[in-house]
Each structure stands twice: as structure tokens, then as C-alpha cells.
Amino acid sequence: MPRSQNKDNFLDKAFTKMAEGIVKVMPIDSKEKEAYLYYRKGLAAQNDGDYSEALEYYEESLKLEDNQVDRGETLKNMAIIYMSNGDEERAINTYKKALGQNPKQPSCLKNMGLIYEKRGRMAQRNGNQDECDIWFDQAAEVWSKAVRLYPGGYLDIENWLKTTGRGNVDVYL
């Protein structure tokens, strides 16, 4: 997987080199180091908008990574790519896998809720209120969890939960 050398951002380039150097001298085994380097390359590719290359690097990282928190972070980034590409079902499934590895990722829950809420709005526009309610209830369920994990971090979501009457009182405490 050759990484293109088209980075324009000096700070990103410097940080990447610095991180690679630090990883090489860290007292961790070579498998963990390699997993992290693949992750960093995937992140750089994702930031450059090269999603297919990013996914390849993330897949390689997952093959080597044993740490559940790190696996969850990698899966979350993959789900973000799927979501950006409009592959919502794959994004949801990957967010669920990420949460299975590390359940304390409120951004996964937030993004799943965005997909559910969007589907609810589409059903509403099409005049299907029952389907709309199902999607909105799913959005409320994951968003309530996100707000509990990150209080005050998603004020727009807290507002949606309040205004739609779908939030529990304990969410705001």
C-alpha cells in the first residue's frame, strides 16, 4: 500500500514523523507498533480524503491490534468513512462493532443517531408517521446514551430530545 506523498500540511507531516519516531522507541512489542503505524497511515489518508486507502490501512491495523479501546477507535474511523460515502447500513454496523470494543465512545452513538434521525425525517416527508416514530425513537435511544456519556457535549441533541419529548429526565442530570 504505497502512501502518496502529497501532504501539504507541514504540521501534519511533522507530527506524523514525530509519532513514528516515538513509536519506534516505545517499550511495546513490534505487533503493537505496527498496528499503530497502520492506524496513523490510515488517519493520514482519511484526512487527505483518500478513503479507500484509509480503509486498507485500518483493516491492516485491526489484524494486528489487540487493545479493545484502540480497535474501537479504528472501527469508529472506518464507520465515519462509510457514513461519508453514504453507506449508512455499513456505518451503523461498524459503529456497533466499535461500541462492542469500547462502549465509551459517545461520538459513535451520536453519529448512529444522526442516521436514524435522517431516516425519520425522510419517512415523515413521505407521510409515513409510524416509520418516522420508529426511527426517531431509535435516534432518541442512542442519543440519550451519548448525552449520558458526554454531558453538555451535545447541546443540539439534548435540545432535540427535550423538544421532541423523547428524552428521559435523567439524561440531563
Swiss-Prot record:
Gene: ycf3
Predominant place of localization: membrane
One of the record's GO cellular component terms: plasma membrane-derived thylakoid membrane
Organism: Prochlorococcus marinus (strain NATL2A)
SMART domains: TPR (SM00028)
NCBIfam families (UniProt xref): PRK02603.1 (NF002725)
Cell membrane recorded as keyword: no
One of the GO BP terms on file: photosynthesis
Pfam family, one: TPR_12
Superkingdom assignment: Bacteria
TPR repeats: 35-68, 72-105, 120-153
Localization: Cellular thylakoid membrane
UniProt keyword terms in alphabetical order: Membrane, Photosynthesis, Repeat, Thylakoid, TPR repeat
Family designation: Belongs to the Ycf3 family.
Function: Essential for the assembly of the photosystem I (PSI) complex. May act as a chaperone-like factor to guide the assembly of the PSI subunits.
Mode of membrane association: Peripheral membrane protein
This protein's name: Photosystem I assembly protein Ycf3
InterPro entries with a match to the protein in the record: PSI_Ycf3_assembly, TPR-like_helical_dom_sf, TPR_rpt, Ycf3/AcsC/BcsC/TPR_MFPF
